[in-house]
């Protein structure tokens, strides 16, 4: 808005207001006296532009976006801690609160028999399955302690884009009166949930089915499914949670659909077929994350585009999805999982 308020423009206006019989050339007393003020005014206009960016929700960032969201009763979701299963010596009672260590991470044993990472965020999602845990407490009879699979993934603090999207959903009243968007909002408020899909009247009048992924956009664990159920409808139809009286909610996990990709590729000079495969795998994985519960068709053209834009690819042909040169349609509850990627090197 104030892009034209430059140092030069401000100086020109100031000098034009000086009497014509006074020397205003660069280096003159008047010029040198006005120049510092003009420079500060130019900086002020730059700050005014910044302030305008920060006070409107579509461009606000950080704490300024937090303050706008708070006006609508929305808070930025804090980082959450990963919850994992553990395996311990049979017959040994592990006291609640016992601490364990592995790979620079500390875990606490909880009342429900799980391990919660003390470090918030995605750190606890690391590939630790099968690793031995070091007990930091003396526990009689404990000989083995092993960290197992992730039950509820940890996630980082909510980013600006996600918070802004939730803010707009609220102020535009897209999620109100227990409509589909409202159920989606409730489900995605639960720590550990990534995305939710809503199926109204799926089993008759008053029934709602919610299908969820975890924060990593993978199938949800039974513990996470129960958390969503307890938050929205702990006592079916009684209105004890977020859902209104009479609504009976069923919560289920999304289901993997394994997707295999094959292609014939000519690598760029000085690039190996392994580099090509790695780039294609990364591109497809990112694409699958974005499309989960947003689109249920994996289009051949989209895979073609990923291969075409891979830096190590010179040329390609015969791309297939699950053995066919056709689009792959997912069911309403399926999310794609990348299976085998078969890349055949073309000869020059």
From Swiss-Prot:
It comes from the Bacteria. Belongs to the Mu gp47/PBSX XkdT family. This is Phage-like element PBSX protein XkdT. It comes from Bacillus subtilis (strain 168). The lineage of its organism: Bacteria, Bacillati, Bacillota, Bacilli, Bacillales.
């Amino acid at each position: 808005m104030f892009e034209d308020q430059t140092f030069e423009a401000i100086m020109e206006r100031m000098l034009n207001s000086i009497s014509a019989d006074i020397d205003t050339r660069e280096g003159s007393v008047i010029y040198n006296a006005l120049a510092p003020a003009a420079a500060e005014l130019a900086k002020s206009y730059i700050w005014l532009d910044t302030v305008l960016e920060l006070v409107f929700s579509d461009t606000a960032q950080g704490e300024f976006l937090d303050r706008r969201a708070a006006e609508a009763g929305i808070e930025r979701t804090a980082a959450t801690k990963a919850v994992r299963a553990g395996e311990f010596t049979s017959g040994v009672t592990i006291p609640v609160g016992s601490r364990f260590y592995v790979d620079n991470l500390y875990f606490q044993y909880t009342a429900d028999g799980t391990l919660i990472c003390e470090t918030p965020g995605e750190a606890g999602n690391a590939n630790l399955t099968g690793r031995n845990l070091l007990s930091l407490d003396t526990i009689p009879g404990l000989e083995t302690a092993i960290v197992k699979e992730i039950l509820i993934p940890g996630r980082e603090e909510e980013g600006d884009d996600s918070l802004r999207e939730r803010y707009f959903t609220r102020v535009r009243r897209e999620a109100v009166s227990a409509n589909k968007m409202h159920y989606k909002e409730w489900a995605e408020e639960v720590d550990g949930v990534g995305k939710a899909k809503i199926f109204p009247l799926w089993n008759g009048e008053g029934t709602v089915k919610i299908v969820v992924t975890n924060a990593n956009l993978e199938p949800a664990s039974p513990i996470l499914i129960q958390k969503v159920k307890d938050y929205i409808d702990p006592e079916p139809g009684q209105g004890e949670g977020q859902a209104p009286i009479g609504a009976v909610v069923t919560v289920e996990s999304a289901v993997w659909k394994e997707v295999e990709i094959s292609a014939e590729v000519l690598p760029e000079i000085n690039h190996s077929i392994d580099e090509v495969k790695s780039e294609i795998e990364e591109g497809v994985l990112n694409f699958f994350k974005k499309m989960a519960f947003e689109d249920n068709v994996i289009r051949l053209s989209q895979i073609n585009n990923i291969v075409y834009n891979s830096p190590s690819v010179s040329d390609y042909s015969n791309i297939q999805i699950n053995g066919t040169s056709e689009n792959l349609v997912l069911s309403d509850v399926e999310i794609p999982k990348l299976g085998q990627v078969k890349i055949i090197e073309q000869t020059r």
